[in-house]
Amino acid sequence: SIEEAQERAARFAKGMMAHTAEPQGRSMELYQAFVSAVEQHAKTNSDVAFYADCLNVSPRYLSQVCRKLGEKTPKQIIDTTLLACIHQELMLTTHTFQEIAYGCGFTSQAHFSKFFKKLTGMTPSDFRRQNKK
């Protein structure tokens, strides 16, 4: 009958949606775990392979998930998170640039300044001057 056919079609559609929703859920879980790990370790580790290893996935798969759900590469997410930490340090503390650089995992103040300027278009000292209250 038509009703039976509609019922079967509805069950089939529901099964298909459940099947496709599952990977999305796992991807979202991985993405959230990645973002959480980055927030915890951004100052000490900026290597995508480190996070992929912690999450038991390949860097390539992590990259696919991040691009799909966050519309950024893992490296962009790491750098953005690190930059937010640096912004806080520059605005809320009187630490020297060298102290902030080493505290955020940079090997030198020059590398820190270059990273900051590349992402913001200004030097750490210009940023601090403009944002100090």
Q: Which stretches of residues belong to each language-model region?
A:
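Charge-rich, low-complexity intrinsically disordered segments
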Residues: 45-75
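Residues within helix-turn-helix
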Residues: 49, 60, 96-99, 109-110, ...
